[in-house]
């Protein structure tokens, strides 16, 4: 039976999952992320009618990393016809690590979906072709979505990622060899790493993504962010591809469309009701927040929410 929301529920959930801290591992392949304190834990909710709930470190900003892949897809959907996007990137789960080259080689440079690194790089390549200042445009979009004017990039994280970008560069060059990457590789990589280096809090993320819970409309904006069909499509992609190769396990445990990042954040959507953001930097072997998944599992069980 569904329960009403309040901050006390969120506080209780964080107390239940806090013992998991120490069992995961903070991302260390990006040096600027390796220094993040692993004990951080926060959760926030924004409902479609503008109510906010939070607990723990919900107001502390962190690197959103691959959560940004949803935002870059949203921007691409606003600048490209549907058929142009989906002829360059697929919609299916990969079943492989998010930075895999093997599958990309076998499938002639067409990434399985826009939420693995290869797919997100194709989307960024497309944005480079339509936007005069892709990084500035992303900031404008995110600031409008969350209603906060000082959202920015963490330059240290972006630089750290660029300095350790051999694998992502290899992915881009491999796609270029198949004709599925059209612009200067270092330029597009810089844009991609800056998007990943967006610094936001759980509260800001929940507010940013609430349009996906409301058929593409945000309560605080006059114009729709995307169409109802596009919102449905994005939620479907998040449900099938948003948690790296563990999307099935996450669907089993949590039952919501979601997107994670190696910064420890996860955004999840309850259609017609709310957007949820959690943050705990320690990751499981797939690169998803260990305590974050547990918190979302506790929340959906407590509230009686699931899309299944």
Swiss-Prot record:
The gene is glsA. One of its GO terms (biological process) is glutamine catabolic process. Its EC number is 3.5.1.2. Pfam families: Glutaminase (PF04960). Coiled coil: none annotated. The keyword Repeat does not apply. Belongs to the glutaminase family. Keywords: Hydrolase. Substrate binds at residues 66, 117, 161, 168, 192, 244, 262. One of its GO terms (molecular function) is glutaminase activity. Homotetramer. This is Glutaminase. It comes from Salmonella arizonae (strain ATCC BAA-731 / CDC346-86 / RSK2980). It catalyses: L-glutamine + H2O = L-glutamate + NH4(+). The keyword Hydrolase applies.
